[in-house]
Structure formats: structure tokens, C-alpha cells
């Protein structure tokens, strides 16, 4: 724990003490801190926790979560764990990971993608999609910015909020809440040639929008929202 830029070891000591009081002696400690902890701090933690100083590792903040395995590798935590578990050492396969992480930090271009859904107040609701978009953007040497937009906020009068996007993703969902906003989003993307990726419900939305506004089937919908339909 950092207080006025000084790392305090008491919280770690107390936590390990509590573990030992219930019969658990840690083999390895990962010490969270803003910056890398030095040998003096490691020695102090080791002294008061009965954990060998070589098993005290720094878990400092990183610019991206993908940097963290590299930091652990640099501290040789993998070697220590293998030795502790008496497992054979194998050739490291971290090089592709390092290549990806370095590329992530040096992307030459930038893209802004809108994620239009109804669970956007918690970005991790779409965690797998977020990471998939990130991987795709890095592969194309492009840094990614995702703008999360609540589909219930999208009206005919404010669709211009979508104009600053280079692409739109409408993910899956359930129920009819926010559906009209998603249909407006698909419409806006189509007439303005904004790349649109519809996943699950998002794909249904694009079909509904096209049926209504291009094919003239004004009441086209999904049975998920309306069972008394002519055009399904």
C-alpha cells in the first residue's frame, strides 16, 4: 500500500498473519503497488511473513493487462512456481505474447467504435467483444477506442451522436427494451455507410431495419418482441 509515495508493508504483513492464523502459509506473495517494489521492501515483507524473499514478487500497475504476464516472466515467477511444484522446465512460448503487447503500444492509427446496447453502464458486460475488437484492431496496427452508447438514449432527433464513429457494433441482448434505438442505429449506419456489425440480436435488428425501410414491410419485426406478426 502506498501512502505519500511510500510503500507500506503493514497491510501485507497483517493479511499473511490472518492467513497463518487459520493454518494457511503462503508459498508466494504477489504484492500490488503502483510501482515496482525494491529489494529492501521485499526483504522486509519476507522477514515478517516467513515467505522467502525470492518468492515475493512485484505486481505493479501496468498500462495494459497484457503487460502483466511479461512483468511476471521478467521476475522469473514461472521458474519459481515450476521449482516449487517440482515440474520440468519447458521452452518459453511467451515471444508471440510480447510481440502482440509491443504492437499494442505502438499502433500507428486510431479507430473509434460505438458499442450500442442496453447494458453499457457496465462495460465488462461486453468483455469478450471488447477484447475481440482490441485483438482485431492491433492486428491491423490500429489503436481502439470504444464508445459505449445506451440504445435507449438514441432517438430520431439525436442520431448525429453516431456521426463521429468509424464503426458500430450492436451486440446480443434480450427483451424489447432499447430495441427502437438499435433499429435507428442500424438505419443510420446503413444510410451513412458506417460499417455495422450485428451479433445475435444485433443481426436481427439489421434485418428488421432493412425489411422496414428498404423492402417497405413497415411492421416487420421479430417474434421475440411481437407474436402477432405478418412479416417475421
Question: What are these model-derived regions, one by one?
Answer:
Residues 1-230:
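N-terminal beta1-alpha1 cap of cysteine-dependent amidohydrolase-like domains
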Amino acid at each position: 500500500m502506498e501512502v505519500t509515495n511510500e510503500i507500506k508493508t503493514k497491510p501485507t504483513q497483517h493479511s499473511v498473519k490472518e492467513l497463518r492464523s487459520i493454518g494457511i502459509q503462503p508459498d508466494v506473495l504477489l504484492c500490488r503497488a503502483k510501482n515496482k517494489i525494491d529489494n529492501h521492501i521485499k526483504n522486509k515483507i519476507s522477514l515478517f511473513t516467513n515467505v522467502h524473499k525470492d518468492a515475493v514478487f512485484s505486481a505493479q500497475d501496468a498500462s495494459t493487462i497484457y503487460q502483466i504476464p511479461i512483468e511476471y516472466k521478467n521476475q522469473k515467477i514461472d521458474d519459481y512456481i515450476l521449482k516449487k511444484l517440482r515440474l520440468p522446465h519447458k521452452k518459453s512460448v511467451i515471444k508471440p505474447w510480447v510481440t502482440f503487447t509491443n504492437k499494442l503500444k505502438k499502433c500507428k492509427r486510431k479507430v473509434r467504435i460505438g458499442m450500442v446496447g442496453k447494458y453499457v453502464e457496465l462495460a465488462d458486460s461486453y468483455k469478450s467483444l471488447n477484447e475481440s475488437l482490441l485483438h482485431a484492431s492491433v492486428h491491423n496496427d490500429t489503436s481502439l477506442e470504444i464508445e459505449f452508447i445506451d440504445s435507449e438514449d438514441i432517438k430520431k432527433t439525436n442520431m448525429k451522436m453516431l456521426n463521429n464513429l468509424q464503426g458500430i457494433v450492436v451486440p446480443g441482448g434480450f427483451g424489447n427494451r432499447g430495441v427502437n434505438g438499435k433499429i435507428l442505429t442500424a438505419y443510420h449506419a446503413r444510410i451513412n455507410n458506417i460499417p455495422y456489425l450485428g451479433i445475435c440480436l444485433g443481426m436481427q435488428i439489421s434485418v428488421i431495419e432493412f425489411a422496414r425501410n428498404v423492402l417497405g414491410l413497415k411492421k416487420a419485426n421479430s417474434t421475440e418482441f411481437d407474436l402477432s406478426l405478418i412479416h417475421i
